[in-house]
Amino acid sequence: MIGRLAWVTTQEARGRDEDEPLGLAALERTGVSVDLVDWDDHAVDWSLFDRVVLRSAWDYPQRLDEFSTWLDAVDAVTDLVNPPALVRWSLDKQYLAELAEAGVPITPTVFVPPGSPASFPPGGVVVKPAVGAGSVDAASYGADQHEEATSHVARLHAAGQVVLVQPFLRSIPEEGEWPMVFLDGRFSHAANKRVALPQAGTVDDLFAPETNAAHVATAAQVEVAQAAVDLVSDRLGTPTYARVDLVRDDTGGFCVLEVELVEPSLFLAYAEPAAAERFAAVLAH
């Protein structure tokens, strides 16, 4: 078992991570010494920690170059969880194409690089950057708002972003999303998440408002999410933690909306108490 662990956050996120009190309490019960540390605190000597765990560093999309440099610096002196290769894979949602090529069902997605015109499917659409977190700079548009969606794409392109265009699935308003949490590659627990994406606007906070609830995953949901985690494990190594967000597509099947390996909320507050203990165990050993 390790002796000392850094739980990595950022100043703006302090007090806003629902996982934090449950995770820290569970880690304390293992006997591990835990420090709550901002990732961009230059006074920190990361080599003093046996393990550094990314948790609520939610401002990284706005500081990506700095964050990337930090990943390598920490990884050079201690055990970073998840490792940089996994983090970098998950940073860019163009990984959805890789999942689709491997036969994992994904939300229908068109990737629009800077310099390319955007085209939209009939009906409502969602526009989001390929690199982002917490639904920041993501927005939904109605069937009569494609002009506004085009302007949104142009703004993201001007910032150098590849853009994802997805249909606004009929199931989203009624059912939301299902975050599926995996620890050491094995399914742990699930939740239900309903994200309030702005209508023809963008999120200007660390994350979009959410309404969350407990959820008992079905075998079909676990199968799809496990396929995504297995692909990552086979190609890059097994993530200590992973969250696969599922939605129901317009044919009624479950598909992957995203795979979060950077600093995902794990919805410990909506899971059985043993979930926090499982999380602490994989971090401590």
Q: What is the predicted role of each segment?
A:
Residues 35, 165-167, 237-250:
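A short glycine-rich, hydrophobically flanked beta-strand micro-motif that places a catalytic Asp/Glu
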Residues 2-9, 71-76, 85-175, 219-223, ...:
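Active-site nucleotide/adenylate-binding loops and adjacent lid/helix of ATP-dependent enzymes
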Residues 58, 135, 196-198, 260-270:
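Glycine-rich phosphate/pyrophosphate-binding beta-alpha loops
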Residues 143-234, 255:
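Phosphate-binding site of ATP-dependent enzymes
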Residues 236-239, 248-285:
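C-terminal active-site "lid" helix and adjoining low-complexity regulatory extension at the edge
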Residues 49-54, 128, 179-182, 248, ...:
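A short beta-strand motif that forms the metal-chelation/ATP-contact edge
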Residues 32, 104-105, 121-122, 234-240:
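Short secondary-structure junctions
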Residues 3-108, 113-114:
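Conserved N-proximal alpha/beta basic substrate-recognition cap immediately N-terminal to
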